[in-house]
Regions:
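Membrane-proximal, proline-rich intrinsically disordered regions
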Residues: 22-64, 549-562
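Flexible, polar/acidic helix-loop-strand segments at domain edges
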Residues: 318-430
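Short coil/turn linking the two alpha-helices of tandem helical-hairpin repeats
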Residues: 146-153, 216-222, 446
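Long, intrinsically disordered, low-complexity segments
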Residues: 21-26, 75, 108-109, 177, ...
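Conserved, well-structured interaction surfaces
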Residues: 43-52, 57, 78-149, 165-176, ...
Length: 562
């Protein structure tokens, strides 16, 4: 077992956390929850699984990690990149030493090991609901692993000593565990509203995960498409959820729209009026809640442009707080995806227009022939910009400072103007995606009318206001339904929420959808466009090199091409 090569090996070392006292550096890693024998309360262990989940998607040491799952696809383009995400669109640079690849692999196997320990502790006469919650997280982790890596080691028991003899198990074998875990979870988890906390795992969260997992499994065994439909239908028909189609919550009297209301801080939970929410991950602010805030989540700083670099702009909730502009939506999303009247493309949801908000701002500037901002006397005319005027960007601002962007992660905390961390809740699962999962399952079974019906439910919400002047706007018919239309609709509905890379890999469409991205030279710099993609290599990620090196007694083969 090599030590010191990467500092931490989640796969090999996760099985010995809390059981060994050697001084390998990975054991010095900060742990959010203890899974050793000194923890007797199973509920504390289950809460620990949630904190481990948060540690994955709330990581700040590699700020660009959020972008790894969006750039290099049809919907994402790089902004002011941090670095870890660059090989995910400059594919020729993607290798087995990428920090994002290693981090996700390690953290998923840590989550699996912790879940295995809970499952084992409840094996004889234990708490079925506790076992089910642990199985949910194990299924979540394995579903992500097989989607992104293909064949992976299957470990269903925790180990008290390090092992270096792992091999890769076939996807179908891992899928068997995912399936059985989710079947158990769907039967034994509490119903919505009955869990210890509204953010804890319930039956419908398991159903939603099962729907996604079964759709992936259906690509190799079509019988799973029916299982996907059957898994998610009770969420739709159970009467516990409804699509948000009217203003609600603490911002209802402010300018906005009902779709935007779902994603505003203090409006996201079911208890706050969001009856569309299935799983809203509660991101408690550690200023207000002891033990809150896992690391410093970077979603806002990725998705929100760096407006603070513009004269006349100050950080505020109305503009989403302080962003870094590391991640942009692609030209495909900006200019080719939405139809007229779609509320999901309103300025409250995809912000394209802004106004100078700094009190007392006034500045004389030049405007060039293209309408961009230049220095005074350097353009075709001069104008004086003032507070309340529409923002006019420089031509180069579109890569970092000012560009159309989704607002779902925006929020501003006046006690932290710098805004290093996301402090609002995370939208993980909601009813809008449930309809899309069922539409996909129905399409795969040849039921294009059923798929159109599901998508039209979403479009009835999206075009509700516009239909007052354009009746029938947004309606789709069965003959319009194919996998590309469904993927387009997922982008319209779930931009910045879904892991787009996972969606495209599980539908076997990554190679084709990349071609839609639309960001290309010379309009975009050569270091901001997708290059080097080879579907035979880059559809799957490389297994981290450190894992192969540590596994000296096994045959942990690398994916082809890496």
């Amino acid at each position: 077992m090599l030590s010191g090569t990467s500092g931490f090996s989640g796969f090999t070392s996760a099985f010995v956390i809390g059981t060994t006292s050697c001084s390998d550096s990975f054991l010095d890693e900060k742990m959010y929850s203890s899974y050793g024998p000194e923890v007797s309360d199973v509920n504390a262990k289950l809460v620990g699984l949630h904190r481990q989940y948060a540690a994955i998607w709330g990581m700040s040491s590699q700020q660009g990690f959020v972008g790894c799952w969006q750039v290099g696809t049809d919907v994402g383009a790089p902004g002011d990149t941090q670095g870890v995400e660059v090989p995910f669109y400059r594919y020729q640079e993607l290798n087995a030493e990428n920090a994002g690849v290693s981090f996700l692999w390690e953290k998923l196997y840590e989550l699996i090991n912790s879940a295995n320990q809970i499952i084992a502790s409840q094996a004889e006469g234990g708490d079925a609901a506790a076992t089910a919650e642990a199985m949910f997280f194990r299924a979540y982790a394995y579903n992500m692993l097989v989607t992104l890596w293909g064949d992976v080691p299957l470990v269903t028991e925790s180990t008290s000593i390090p092992r270096t003899d792992y091999t890769r198990n076939a996807v179908a074998e891992v899928d068997g565990v995912i399936d059985s875990d989710l079947v158990y979870a769907m039967s034994n988890l509490p119903v919505v509203g009955a869990a210890k906390n509204e953010s804890r795992i319930n039956q419908d969260m398991a159903r939603q995960l099962a729907g996604e997992a079964y759709l992936r499994m259906g690509m190799r065994d079509a019988s799973y498409f029916k299982k996907a439909e059957d898994a998610v239908t009770p969420i739709i028909t159970g009467g516990k959820y409804e699509l948000i189609s009217a203003r609600y919550g603490k911002y209802a009297a402010e300018p906005g729209d009902y779709y935007h209301d779902m994603f505003r801080w203090g409006n996201q939970r079911r208890s706050q009026g969001n009856m569309e929410a299935i799983w809203t991950f509660e991101m408690e602010y550690n200023r207000d809640v002891n033990g809150g805030t896992i690391d410093n989540p970077q979603q806002r700083r990725n998705w929100v442009p760096a407006f603070h670099k513009l004269d006349g702009m100050v950080n505020a909730d109305s503009i989403g707080g302080r962003g870094n502009g590391r991640l942009r939506i692609s030209n495909f999303v900006k200019y080719g995806l939405y139809e007229k009247g779609d509320i999901r493309n309103s300025n409250y949801n995809i912000r394209r227009v802004m106004w100078y908000n700094k009190l007392g701002f006034s500045k004389e500037v030049g405007i060039d022939a293209k309408g961009f901002l230049v220095d005074k006397d350097k353009g075709v005319r001069n104008v004086t910009l003032k507070t309340g005027d529409q923002v006019i960007p420089h031509e180069g601002d579109s890569l970092n400072v000012f560009y159309p962007h989704p607002t779902k992660w925006g929020a501003y905390d006046e006690t932290d103007d710098f805004g290093y961390a996301v402090v609002k809740d995370w939208p993980v699962m909601r009813l809008g995606e449930t309809y899309l999962l069922r539409a996909e399952a129905r399409f795969r079974q040849g039921n294009t009318q059923g798929a159109a019906d599901d998508i039209n439910v979403l479009r009835d919400r999206a075009f509700k206001d516009y239909r007052a002047v354009a009746p029938g706007a947004g309606k789709v018919t069965a003959d319009q339904i194919d996998i590309d239309f469904i993927l387009d609709e997922r982008a319209r509905e779930l931009i910045s929420e879904e892991n787009r890379r996972m969606t495209l890999v599980r539908t076997n469409t990554l190679a084709e959808r990349i071609k839609l991205n639309g960001d290309m030279e010379p309009a975009a710099p050569s270091n901001k466009v997708i290059t080097g993609f080879d579907a035979n290599i880059h559809t799957l990620l490389p297994i981290p090199l450190t894992e192969i090196q540590l596994n000296k007694d096994g045959d942990l083969k690398q994916n082809p091409g890496y």
